[in-house]
């Protein structure tokens, strides 16, 4: 039996009208089932520690699912119960970057993932 793969596509967005505010995510990932992946979301144009970063999932043909948020100022997190044990949210304030690690990947994790302020 050949390998199967999981494709993760990453997008970012931000609320507000200030065009200088940006959230830049890492690129698409192709990973094996059972593996883990850590994706990044680098912020610029605002004070990183002052705003929550939310993570959202969208599977093909389905609606948006909120995964959780992290507050960079304190590192506090809140997760959707469905994603506890699946997603781990962290930040590196020195580089204004938020991270989401997804573990024990399955075909159900093949989706578009968004970070949003």
UniProtKB/Swiss-Prot annotation:
Coiled coil: none annotated. Residues 20-49 are annotated as: Framework-1. Residues 1-19 form the signal peptide. PROSITE patterns: IG_LIKE. It holds the Pfam family V-set. One of its GO terms (cellular component) is immunoglobulin complex. One of its GO terms (biological process) is adaptive immune response. InterPro entries: Ig-like_dom, Ig-like_dom_sf, Ig-like_fold, Ig_V-set, IgHV. It comes from the Eukaryota. Keywords: Adaptive immunity, Disulfide bond, Immunity, Immunoglobulin, Immunoglobulin domain, Signal. Residues 69-85 are annotated as: Complementarity-determining-2. PANTHER family: IMMUNOGLOBULIN HEAVY CHAIN (PTHR23266). This is Immunoglobulin heavy variable 1-84.
């Amino acid at each position: 039996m050949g390998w199967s793969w999981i494709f993760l596509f990453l997008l970012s967005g931000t609320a507000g009208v200030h065009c200088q505010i940006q959230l830049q995510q890492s690129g698409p990932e192709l990973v094996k089932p059972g593996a883990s992946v850590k994706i990044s979301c680098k912020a610029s144009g605002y004070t990183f520690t002052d705003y929550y970063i939310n993570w959202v999932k969208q599977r093909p043909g389905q609606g948006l699912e909120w995964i959780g948020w992290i507050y960079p100022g304190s590192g506090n997190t809140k997760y959707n119960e469905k994603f506890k044990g699946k997603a781990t949210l962290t930040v590196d304030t020195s580089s204004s970057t938020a991270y989401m690690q997804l573990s024990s990947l399955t075909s159900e994790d093949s989706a578009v993932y968004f970070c949003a302020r």
